[in-house]
Amino acid sequence: MTLDLNFLNYIYNKMISIKQINEKDIDLCYELDSKTISLWSKKQWANEFKKEGTKIFGLLFTNLIIGICVFQVVLDEAQINYFVVNKKFRKKGFGSYLMSYLIKNCEKLNLKKILLEVSQGNVTAERFYSRFDFSTVGIRKNYYKDGSHALLKEKKLITK
C-alpha cells in the first residue's frame, strides 16, 4: 500500500488553522504563555484584548491553540507585541506558518512595515525573524528586567 502525499498534505492542512481569538480565550492564552515565555499576567492579557487596533491570532492544531501572535496596528505600521509557539511544536514550521499569515494580513491592510522587539540574547528568535527579512534598526539598552537589551526589528512590506 502506498500513501498519496497529496492526500497527506490535504489532511495536514485540515488540522492546522489560524483564527482571530477574543477575550473568551484569555485562559488559553495565559496557559500557553505560562508554559513558554511567561511574559504577561492574566490582567495584561485582558488589557491586550481591549487595546484599540490590536488583533490576536491563534494558531490551532486540530482545536488546540499552539501559537499566538498579538499585534497592534497604528497608522500604517504593525507592532508585534507577542509571538510564541508551544515548545512541543517548535522547529516544525508552525511559527513560520503563523508569521507568513501575519505578513500577508498586514500587506492586505496596506501597512508599510512590521516592528517588533526581541532580546539581544535570544539568538533563536533573531534567526527566525531574519528569515523573514526583519532587520535591526535600533537598540533599547537595559530594556528587560534582567538588564538585557532589546533589539528593535523592522520588516518593510510590499504594498500596492
Residue ranges and their predicted role:
Residues T2-I11, H149-K160:
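Terminal substrate-recognition subdomain of acyl/acetyltransferases
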Residues I11, I16, Q20-K88, M99-Y101, ...:
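Acetyl-CoA-dependent GNAT
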Residues N86-K92, Q120-N122:
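Active-site acidic-Proline motif in GNAT/NAT acetyltransferases
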Residues K92, L109-K112:
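Short coil/turn segments at alpha/beta junctions that flank glycine-rich nucleotide-binding fingerprints
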Residues G95, M99, N122-A125, N142-G147:
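Short glycine/proline-centered loop/turn elements that form peptide/ligand docking sites
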Residues L102-C106, I114, A125:
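Short hydrophobic clusters on alpha-helical segments that form packing/core surfaces
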Residues K113, S119, E154-L157:
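Conserved catalytic core of the tyrosine transesterase superfamily
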Residues L115-E117, S130-L151:
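Conserved catalytic-core motifs of GNAT/GCN5-like acyltransferases
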